[in-house]
């Protein structure tokens, strides 16, 4: 009866499909939509590796800090170039979080995995910035987990807007004081990208305006608009957990390399 109608309406409003025909309008024509979810995940990991190589290796290597040229008052170094390239990783991960949330068979397990790897990643994250067991900020998995909770609130409470807004404001406040990577800006970016998920061009414009202090992130929406709605080559638990593990493992390797090359 009415309960079935509510569920159907809920599905119609909030769920998207994996088929090419029902993809949201893109900046690019269909022939350029060639990136699967797996390809986007691989790209985001590569960009993140480039970024963190800048943080841990190039920041300590004097040749990478030499000024190549200036643009206005900005001094351009190899370190700066690498960090700017890496800025594109985060919006892609936000996009993949939303896609995963919409299409996963088990949302509770999805959230548990995000929290588990946030906890696992905290030790290498702390060593990245303070080279100790403790650092006042938290890793990006916590940002994604808070975003996941926000998505749960948006969907579960869509018929109770006051309670829904209260939950989002509460999560926003927590993200502000918790100091996870990208902070409250990152949390609200996930909410913005979700709300504009069926309008990719608007999603790109509003997200870029929101994260204007990191304007280099706008380049991530080129690849996001090349998404074809397909899962891609990542199949099975082993491949899935490889990408979860990539974050803490690559941080650990880079921390060890920094210690060997510059701090020992």
Name the predicted role of every residue range.
Residues 1-6:
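Short, small-residue-biased leader/transition segments that mark boundaries at the very start
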Residues 14-264:
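Alpha-helical transmembrane segments and their immediate juxtamembrane cytosolic regions
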């Amino acid at each position: 009866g009415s309960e079935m109608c509510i569920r159907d309406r809920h599905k119609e409003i909030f769920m998207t499909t994996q088929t090419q025909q029902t993809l949201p309008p893109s900046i690019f024509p269909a022939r350029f939509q060639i990136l699967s979810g797996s390809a986007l995940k691989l790209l985001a990991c590569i960009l993140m590796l480039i970024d963190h190589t800048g943080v841990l290796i190039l920041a300590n290597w004097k040749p990478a800090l030499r000024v190549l040229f200036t643009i206005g008052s900005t001094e351009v170094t190899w370190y700066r170039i690498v960090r700017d390239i890496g800025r594109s990783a985060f919006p892609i991960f936000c996009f993949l979080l939303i896609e995963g949330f919409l299409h996963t068979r088990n949302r509770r397990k999805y959230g548990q995995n995000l929290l588990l790897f946030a906890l696992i990643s905290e030790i290498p994250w702390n060593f990245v910035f303070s080279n100790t067991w403790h650092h006042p900020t938290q890793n990006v998995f916590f940002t994604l987990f808070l975003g996941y909770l926000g998505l749960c609130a948006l969907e579960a409470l869509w018929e109770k807007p006051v309670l829904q807004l209260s939950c989002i404001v509460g999560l926003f406040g927590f993200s502000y004081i918790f100091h996870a990577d990208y902070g409250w800006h990152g949390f609200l970016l996930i909410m913005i990208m979700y709300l504009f998920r069926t309008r990719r061009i608007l999603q790109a414009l509003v997200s870029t305006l929101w994260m204007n202090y990191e304007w280099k992130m706008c380049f991530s929406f080129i690849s996001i608009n090349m998404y074809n709605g397909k899962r891609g080559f990542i199949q099975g638990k082993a491949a899935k957990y490889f990408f979860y593990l990539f974050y803490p493992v690559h941080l650990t390797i880079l921390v060890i390399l920094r210690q060997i090359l510059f701090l020992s």
